Amino acid sequence: VPESAPAAPAAPEAEQPLGEPADPALVSIEGLSVHYLGRESWVLDSVSLTHLRAQVTAIIGPSGCGKTTLVRALCGLIPHCLPSEYAGSLRLSGTEVADATVQTLAQTVAYVGQSPDAAVVTRTVHNDVAFPLQNLCLPRSEITARVEEALRAVGLIERIWDDPWTLSGGQRQRLALAVALAMRPQLLVLDEPTSAIDATGREDFYALISSLTASGTAVVVIDHDLDPVLPIIDQVLALNADGRTIAVGSPREVFMSHRRELIDAGVWMPRALREADDDLFLGAAAPEVALTCAEAGIRVPRLADLCAHNEVRYLEKQVRDSAESWQRVEAIDTREVVAGRPRPEARTSVELVDLEVPGRAPRVSLRLGGGEFVALVGPNGAGKSSILSALAGLVRSRADKATVCGRDVGKGRHLVGYVFQNPEHQFVATTVGAELAVGGTSLERVDELLEQFHLTAHRGHHPLTLSGGQARRLSVATMVSEERDVIVLDEPTYGQDWDNTCELMDFIDQLRDQGRTVIMATHDLELALEHCTHIVALPGAPRGGTVPLPEQEAGVGDDADEPSGVPATGVATPRAGDLDLMPVPPRPQPRRGLFTSLNPFTLFASVLPVMVMVFALRNHHLNLGILLAASVLIVAARASLRRTVASVVAPWVVTALMTWIFSSGVHHQETAVRLYDLGDAVTGGTGIGALIALVLVSGVSTDPGALIRTLTTTFRMPYRLGAAGTAAIAFITRFHDDFVLLRTARALRGVGGRWGLLAPVVRWTGSILPLMILAIQHAERVALSMDSRAFGAHKRRTEMTDAPWRARDWSVVVLTWVLVAITWKTLH
C-alpha cells in the first residue's frame, strides 16, 4: 500500500496572473455578444466596458437582459465551461479570456452566482470554503486561517462544522460569499450576492466590500437594489431588455442623464430619485440633486427598527387623516376591525395561537379576518420560511390553536396557496399554459394571467426551462389561479426587477380587495413597510444568528433614531468586534468505537475475502457464524443507537425473508430458480444475509467522505474523482428533500386527488421526471461552482486531513485473511 500523499503538494510553477500588474485596466470589453450553442439568438448586443483595478462597477438592467451572461463571461465560465461562444473581445489584464487557463482565471477572478444552493459542493461549511484553496495548493495553515477569516466576515463562524444544507437560504448565500472572499481575487464578481440575505447582513456585506476595494480588489456587482453599495460605486453599466447598452459612466451621470430610459426599462432607481420631479434633472439643477440616501437624508429601515432579540413583535399600519404610521401592538386581530374600520360581519380566515415549529421558528399568534397583507421579517434563520411551511402543511408544527378558514392546520393538510422559495419545486405540468390550468382554471383566465405576468410568449415552454425571474412570476400566477382564500409567499420579489415587483404588489392589492389574505416572508423591509397592513417581526436565530448590542438595548447609539411610527428595539447582526471574540467551535469528534483508529479502507480490504468465501463454500453454518460475528462487531463499532439497531436487525430480517421465499417457492426441479448457486433455501438465505452483514460492518462506522479522502491520499486516486464523489454525497440530502417537496407540491395543487387511495402513487411517479430535470440542472450549477473555484487548476491538491496506513491496519487485514484461509481449508 503506498504511503500517504503529502499534505500540500508543490504546485506546478504558478502561471503569472493575467497581464501585467501595472496595467490599470483589469477588464477590457469591446463589442461583446454571446451565443449559447443550440440557441438561435445571441445574448448581449455589442457591449463595451473598461474596468480599472480597485474599481467597483455595477451592472443594471431588467430581468433577462443578459447581466448574468456578461459576468459569466468575465469569469471565464463562458466559453470554457458552458457550451457557448462570444463575438468581440473580452480581456483580463490584456489576455483574452478564451485563451486563459483554469489556473490563471482562478487566481484572478472569484465568482458568486445567483443560486446559493449551487455553492454547496462538500458536506461541511468549513470544507466548502476550503475547497478552492485546496485546489490552489495552499498550505494547510494558510487555508485554515483564510477559512476562519472569511466565515467571521460573513457571520458564520459558529456554523463552521455544520452541514451546509442545515443553513437557511440566506445563510447559504453568506457561505457562497465566504468562499469568494477566501480566494482573495484581483476581481470579485457578484451576481445578486445579497438577494437572500437580511437587511442588516446586506449592509454589513457591502461595508466589507468597501474595505476590499480600499485594499485593491476590483468588484463587478449585479444587484437590483444598489442603495447600500451606491456610495462606493465608480461606474454603472446600464442595459436595456435587448442587452443593448443604455449608458456607461459614473452613477450620477447614468442615473441623472438617463433617468427616463432606465425607468422605462424597469430598472430599480436609487431611493433618492424615485419620487423626484423630472424637471430637477434638466439644466444646471441636475448636479445638485441628491443621489444617495445619505445625500437625501433618507434613513433606510433596519432590522433593529423592527425586531427584538428574544421575542416576536407585532406591528400594524394605522391611517389617520390620510397619513400612515406604524405602531407596535400586543396582538394582530382583524376579525372585527380592519384598517381601522369595522367589518360588516365578523369572520376568520386565519387563526394562530402560539403556532411554532420546534427548533426552527418561535411561537406566533395571529387572528385575521381576510383582506390583510402580512409580512414576516427577521434575520436569516429566524424561521420565516418554517412558519409559512407550517401553514401550508409541509412541516410538523404545534399550537394551542391553528386554523385556516375554520380547518385545523397540520402536516399533510394543504389549506393555503403556497409559493415556494424555490419556484421550481411547485411546478406540476409540462407547459406554462397547462401549469396555470391545473385545478380547472378556464382558458380565458389562463390567457389573462399569462398576459398579466408577462408569460404569453412562453405559453408552450416547459416551466423548468424558464429563467429565474420568469419562474418566480409563474409560481405566483399558479397560486392566484387556484382561487385560494389564503396565499403565502416565500420571498416573491427575489430576482425581480422594479416593474415586475410593482406589478406584483398591485396584484396583491387586487387579491386583498377580493377579501383574500396574503402572508409574505421577505427581506425587503422597505417593501413591507410601504405595502403591507401588518408585520410580524421574528427575533434572531438561536444559533449563528444575531446578538444584541448593549447601546441598542439601552436605547442609545446609532440605532436609537427610528423612522416615523416604528419602535426601536435592539437586534443586529454581529459586528466585526463581536465576531473576533467568538472562538472557533471545535471539530466534532466521532464516537470512539472498535474501528475508530483504523484507516477507513481497512474494513473494506478485510471483508472482501470473507465475501468470496461465502460465495465459494456455500455453508449455512459458516453463514450463520458470520451473521453472529458481524452483529457483535456492529455493536462494538458504537455508531448511533438508531444506526446500530438497524444494522444489526436488517441482515437477520433479510435472512429470514429470503429463506422463506426460497423454501416456499416452486419446488419442481424443472422450474426451480436459484440466485447464482448459493445452495439450498437455508444456505441461500443465510448467504445473502451474511453478505449484507459484511457490507454493514465495513460501513457502519465509516464516513463516506473519509473513505474518499483515503482513496485520494493513500491510494492516489485522482482528486477530481474524489471531489465529484464528495459533491454527489453532499447532494443526496438535497435530492431527497427535492423529491419530498415535489410530491408535496402536487398534493398542494390537488394532483392525483381523483385517484383516491392511489393518489400518493400518482404523485410519486409524477415527481420522478421533474426530479431528474432538477437534478441535472443542479448538477450543472454545482459544476459551474466547482469550475469557478479552481477545480482542475493543478494535478494535485492540498488535503486537510491525513489517512495514513499504519501497522494496525496491516495487522487487521493480515489477521482476517489468515482466518479466512484457515476456515477455507477446514471447510472446503
Where are these regions (language model features)?
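H-loop/switch region of ABC-family ATPase nucleotide-binding domains
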Residues: 223-224, 522-523
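Conserved ABC ATPase signature
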Residues: 163-167, 171, 462-466
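Helix-to-loop junction immediately C-terminal to a conserved catalytic motif
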Residues: 75, 392
